[in-house]
Amino acid sequence: MQGVTIVDHPLVRHKLTRMRDKQTSTKTFRALMRETATLLCYEVTRALPTHTVEIETPVGPTKAEEISGKKMVFAPILRAGLGMAEGMLDLVPSARVAHIGLFRDPVSLEAVEYYYKTPDDIADRLVIVVDPMLATGHTAVAAIARLKRSGVTDLRFVCLVASVQGVETLRAAHPDVPIWTAAVDAELNDHGYIVPGLGDAGDRTFGTR
């Protein structure tokens, strides 16, 4: 699928399998989400620009590379996205964090905003939106639209599992925003959940129902 990168790495596949298993405990699920998010972050940042600097090692001078370009913001969609943001911060601890509160109306399945807090200079940063599940796609579409209204132009979306419908919906609304995911599942059920998916990522992360 154009604009979609499926991170097909043995560690990612292994961790995702354990997350899909309904017998996996809340503690283990939370840890696996964090670990998998770190691996996905490694891939989504693969093409970051760098520049050459001169440094002194303990044994002599050398030229080496540092990251250049825009500073990063991780923007988890509350609440499930928080578990992924932690794993990404493990890899890029200097990144800022925005919070986007959206819930899915159980009848219309449309996204409803209830909270939005970002760094003041977010328009000047690379923003990576994170949400474990890209199901109907409505929540991701709404979150990205909200960020664009704040002036953000450099956006990426990262999830654990996407549905075909979710990918199509997000790409249709925001064709300029690339997607990274660990898997793409074929179906949604009548409640808008991905099948086979991994259940409600927020409930499984925080031990709620």
Swiss-Prot record:
Which residues are 5-phospho-alpha-D-ribose 1-diphosphate-binding? 79, 104, 131-139, 200
What switches its activity on or off, per the activity regulation note?
Answer: Allosterically activated by GTP.
> What does the record's cofactor remark say about binding?
Binds 1 Mg(2+) ion per subunit. The magnesium is bound as Mg-PRPP.
Catalytic activity annotation: UMP + diphosphate = 5-phospho-alpha-D-ribose 1-diphosphate + uracil
Pathway, per record: Pyrimidine metabolism; UMP biosynthesis via salvage pathway; UMP from uracil: step 1/1
**Could you say which cofactors this protein requires?**
Mg(2+)
Looking at its record, which EC class is this enzyme?
transferase
For this protein, the record's InterPro entries field holds: PRibTrfase_dom, PRTase-like, Upp_B, UPRTase/APRTase, Ura_phspho_trans
- UniProt binding sites for uracil: 194, 199-201
EC code(s) of this entry: 2.4.2.9
Q: Which domain of life is it from?
A: Bacteria
Q: Which Gene3D superfamilies match?
A: 3.40.50.2020
According to its UniProt entry, one GO biological process term is: UMP salvage
Q: Which UniProt keywords are present, listed alphabetically?
A: Allosteric enzyme, Glycosyltransferase, GTP-binding, Magnesium, Nucleotide-binding, Transferase
Molecular-function GO term, any one: uracil phosphoribosyltransferase activity
User: What does this chain do?
Assistant: Catalyzes the conversion of uracil and 5-phospho-alpha-D-ribose 1-diphosphate (PRPP) to UMP and diphosphate.
Protein family per UniProt: Belongs to the UPRTase family.
Question: What is the protein's given name?
Answer: Uracil phosphoribosyltransferase
* Organism, scientific name: Caulobacter sp. (strain K31)
